[in-house]
């Protein structure tokens, strides 16, 4: 998104719209399938030779669940976007797309789960436990922590 400085009045200017999800430039990421449109509500104002932009950003993202490995949709919201850009006299425009992209990526959850009730996958056979139980025989071995019960501290 490019902000044309000549079009910003002294009191500032309001921008609302969306950019295609392609601005996120996500390629070959095993955890993220795709981003939807990046929607923005921004306010830009020139202050002392700078362009100050603040507002909010939202995007839908298709992500892989960290527990069951299925893709699901979640919303990434940035409610406190704030950046100041140098805008000396003679500058025609300021490009802010890279900062919008960066802010959305910083708000993508690192350990995303499709739901709080997700049971994940069986660690032995990899079966999706949300779809049913697996046929693995769980070995009931000795409790490895029971040794600590015998410590006298």
Stretch-by-stretch model annotation:
Residues 1-153:
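Structured interface patches
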């Amino acid at each position: 998104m490019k902000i044309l400085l000549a079009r910003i009045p002294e009191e500032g200017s309001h921008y609302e719209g969306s950019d295609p999800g392609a601005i996120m430039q996500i390629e070959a990421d095993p955890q993220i399938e795709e981003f939807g449109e990046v929607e923005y509500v921004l306010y830009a104002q020139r202050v002392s030779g700078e362009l100050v932009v603040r507002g909010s950003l939202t995007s839908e993202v298709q992500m892989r669940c960290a527990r069951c490995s299925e893709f699901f949709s979640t919303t990434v919201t940035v409610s406190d976007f704030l950046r100041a850009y140098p805008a000396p006299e003679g500058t025609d425009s300021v490009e802010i797309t890279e900062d919008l992209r960066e802010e959305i990526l910083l708000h993508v959850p690192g350990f995303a789960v499709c739901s709080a009730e997700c049971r994940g996958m069986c660690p032995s056979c990899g079966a999706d436990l949300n779809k049913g139980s697996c046929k693995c025989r769980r070995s009931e071995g000795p409790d490895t922590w029971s040794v600590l019960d015998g410590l006298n501290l």
